[in-house]
């Protein structure tokens, strides 16, 4: 689905894996944009957790509309600090937000926002269908489990802030690690687990 590439830094203009040089968190304060970069040095790009955090902050401070479109700098009051990082390309009019200027220019572009919207749609629609098919609403969920090594780096406030997960489950999100690896090891070591997996596979619909 669309979620993997966008949230792992692919299809993002300056996306990269979660390694040294990747922006992993973004905070917008009155004095400007503050970045958390893996390794502590200057940013070389942005990884999945960084793009989610950035979008959540842009929504919170009013630079990004709920539709996913950037506001135009001309619509902001004179002297507004947000004009310092909200940019418009003079050639085609496209808008972006500058996270870092030197030594490497790192932006969040309108296209990046669209990629994350596709990811959000893929995940959220699956959640909504599961809830509807079982007669549930988000407030009735006891727990939401986030699997995978990458998933453990996604903060609850970012997942709910951009709408990937419903706001009602923010305090019920738990991280369960690399369940694919755990399941593979269990299947190799236990015939009973393999039989259980085969039985479950026959019951699962899609």
Language-model features, listed with the residues they occupy:
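Acidic, glycine/GT-rich loop-and beta-edge segments that sit at the periphery of enzyme/chaperone cores
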Residues: 186-206
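Hydrophobic alpha/beta core scaffold segments
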Residues: 124-138, 154, 162-168
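Non-transmembrane, aqueous-exposed alpha-helical and coiled segments at domain scale
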Residues: 23-31, 127, 134-139, 181, ...
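Glycine-rich phosphate-binding loops at beta-strand->alpha-helix junctions
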Residues: 138-157
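A contiguous, well-structured pocket-lining segment that forms one wall/lid of small-molecule binding clefts
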Residues: 59-134
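Glycine-rich and small/hydrophobic secondary-structure elements
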Residues: 110-119, 164-186
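Conserved phosphate/anionic-ligand binding catalytic regions in large, soluble enzymes, centered on
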Residues: 43-64, 147, 152
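Glycine-rich phosphate-binding loop of actin/hexokinase-like ATP-binding domains
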Residues: 1-50, 155-177
């Amino acid at each position: 689905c669309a979620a993997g590439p966008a949230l792992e830094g692919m299809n993002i203009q300056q996306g990269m894996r979660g390694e040294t040089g990747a922006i992993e968190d973004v905070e917008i304060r009155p004095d400007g944009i503050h970045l958390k970069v893996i390794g502590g040095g200057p940013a070389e790009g942005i990884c999945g957790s960084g793009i989610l955090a950035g979008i959540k902050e842009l929504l919170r401070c009013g630079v990004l509309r709920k539709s996913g479109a950037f506001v135009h700098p001309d619509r902001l009051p004179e002297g507004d600090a947000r004009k310092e990082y909200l940019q418009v390309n003079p050639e085609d009019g496209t808008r972006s937000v500058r996270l870092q200027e030197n030594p490497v220019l790192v932006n969040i572009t309108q296209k990046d926002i669209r990629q994350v919207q596709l990811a959000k749609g893929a995940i959220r629609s699956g959640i909504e269908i599961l809830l509807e098919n079982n007669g549930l609403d988000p407030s009735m969920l006891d727990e939401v489990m986030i699997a995978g090594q990458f998933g453990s780096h996604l903060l609850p406030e970012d997942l709910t802030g951009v709408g990937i997960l419903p706001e009602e489950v923010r305090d019920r999100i738990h991280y369960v690690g690399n369940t694919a690896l755990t399941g593979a090891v269990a299947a190799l070591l236990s015939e009973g687990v393999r039989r259980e997996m085969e039985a479950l596979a026959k019951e699962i619909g899609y």
